[in-house]
Regions:
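Peripheral terminal and linker regions in Fe-S/redox and tRNA-modifying enzymes
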Residues: 1-373
Length: 373
C-alpha cells in the first residue's frame, strides 16, 4: 500500500532505534528484560504462544480515525496479522500474531498515515481517550476533540511520559454525562461552564485526579471547581509530574496514582499538584494561552442543551416500537443529532470488538462518500 505522506522525523528516529535494538536482541547482544521494557514502551506486547508472535497496539487518540488510516489498518491486518483487528475499551486498535521481524515495517506503515504505537503500553502515558460523541453531542459544553489531540501531542515523547512508576490514563468528556468516565482514571477532564459577571458563561473544565478500579478502587477527586481553558495542559502535566515525583517505584501493585490518595491523603495530593502547576506556569519555557491545535480546529459545541429528534443522550426511548417501521426503530435508539453543527452520529456495533479488513475499508468508503475526510 502506497501513501504519499512523509513520516514524522521523530517517528522515523523511533523506528530506526527499534530496528537497532531488535537486531541486538536477535543477535543475543541485548538481554530479554531490557528489550521487553523497550518493546512495551513502543506499544508491542509479546504473546504467550511462543515464538516471535507479537501484539501491536495502535493509539487512536479520542477514538477518531480518517479514511486513509482505516485503509492502512485493513492492509496491515491482511498483510501482517490475521485479517482482522480488535478495538479496546480505551480506543486503541490491537493487531495480533504480528511477527517480531515485521514490526519496524508495520510501524512505518502506521506512521505514514499519522498513527503511532509509541507509549501505547508500559509505564507511560497511555492513549488519550475521549467521549465517542465529541463534536456531535447535543449537550456538550465544548468539543473536546482538539483538547484531547493537543494533550496527546504535548505528552507524546514528553520526558515525563517515559518511565513512570506505573501507567497513567487520561480521558475527556464534553458534558456532565461523562461518557469518558472521568471517575476511574488518573486524570479525568469534564467540560463545564461558570457564570461571568456580565451574565454570560465561560466554558472551561473540571479536572479530576487519582481515580481507578481494580485493587483498592477509588473515585477520582476534583482538583478545583473550575479550570480555565488556558490552564488545562499545565494542570494535566502538573498531575503527571506529581505522580512521577511521588509514585511508588518499589511495588508495581501499589504504584498507580490512586495509591497516593492513601499515602498522602486527598488534600496533600491536591496541594502538590496545584503547586507543581504554579511552578509550570511561572516557567519561561511554558507556552501561554490556548494550544495551537485548539485554535486551528475550534472547540465550539455541537449544540448545548438543544432539543433533538429523535433521542438525545441519556434520555429513555419513548417510541412505541409496534407503531413504526424497522428503520424508525433503529434510528430512535442509534442516531444522535448535534443541531448546532448539523452533525449526525450513528452507532455501529463490533461483535466482540473485532473489525475485519473489509469492515475497515467499508467504513473508509462511507466516510469519503459523506465528505468526512
Amino acid at each position: 500500500m502506497t501513501i504519499s505522506r512523509e513520516i514524522d522525523p521523530a517517528a522515523k528516529a523511533d523506528i530506526e532505534k527499534f530496528e537497532r535494538m531488535l537486531e541486538l536482541y536477535l543477535n543475543g547482544e541485548l538481554e530479554e528484560d531490557r528489550f521487553r521494557i523497550f518493546r512495551l514502551n513502543n506499544g508491542i506486547y509479546g504473546q504467550r504462544q511462543g515464538g516471535h508472535n507479537q501484539m501491536v497496539r495502535v493509539k487512536i487518540p479520542y477514538g477518531r480515525l480518517q479514511p486513509e488510516q482505516l485503509e492502512m489498518l485493513a492492509y496491515i491486518a491482511e498483510t501482517y496479522s490475521r485479517g482482522w483487528a480488535h478495538i479496546t475499551t480505551r480506543q486503541n486498535i490491537q493487531l495480533h500474531f504480528v511477527q517480531l521481524e515485521n514490526i519496524p515495517q508495520v510501524m512505518r506503515d502506521l506512521n505514514s498515515v499519522g498513527l503511532t504505537t509509541r507509549e501505547a503500553c508500559g509505564d507511560t502515558v497511555r492513549n488519550i481517550t475521549g467521549c465517542h460523541l465529541a463534536g456531535a453531542c447535543p449537550y456538550e459544553v465544548l468539543d473536546i476533540s482538539p483538547w484531547a489531540e493537543a494533550t496527546f501531542r504535548h505528552l507524546l515523547r514528553n520526558p515525563y511520559s517515559q518511565r513512570l512508576p506505573r501507567k497513567f490514563k487520561i480521558n475527556f468528556s464534553g458534558c456532565a454525562t461523562d461518557c469518558g468516565q472521568a471517575m476511574f482514571n488518573d486524570v479525568g477532564v469534564i467540560a463545564v461552564m461558570r457564570p461571568r459577571e456580565d451574565g454570560t458563561v465561560e466554558p472551561g473544565f473540571r479536572v479530576f485526579f487519582a481515580g481507578g478500579l481494580g485493587a483498592n478502587p477509588h473515585a477520582a477527586q476534583a482538583l478545583e471547581e473550575f479550570t480555565p481553558r488556558e490552564q488545562l495542559l499545565p494542570t494535566i502535566e502538573a498531575a503527571l509530574r506529581t505522580f512521577d515525583h511521588y509514585g511508588n517505584r518499589d511495588n508495581k501493585l501499589r504504584a498507580r496514582m490512586k495509591w497516593l490518595l492513601d499515602t498522602m491523603g486527598v488534600d496533600e495530593l491536591r496541594e502538590r499538584i496545584l503547586k507543581e502547576r504554579k511552578l509550570l506556569l511561572a516557567a519561561t519555557t511554558w507556552a501561554e494561552g490556548i494550544p495551537e491545535t485548539v485554535q486551528q480546529a475550534g472547540d465550539g459545541p455541537a449544540g448545548v442543551s438543544t432539543a433533538v429528534d429523535p433521542t438525545p443522550v441519556g434520555v429513555p426511548v419513548t417510541l412505541r416500537l409496534s407503531e413504526t417501521n424497522p428503520y424508525a426503530r433503529w434510528e430512535a435508539v442509534n442516531v444522535i443529532r448535534g443541531v448546532a453543527k448539523g452533525t449526525v452520529s450513528a452507532y455501529a456495533h463490533a461483535r466482540l470488538g473485532d473489525v475485519t479488513a473489509a469492515q475497515f475499508r467499508g467504513l473508509a468508503e462511507i466516510q469519503r462518500e459523506l465528505g468526512l475526510e
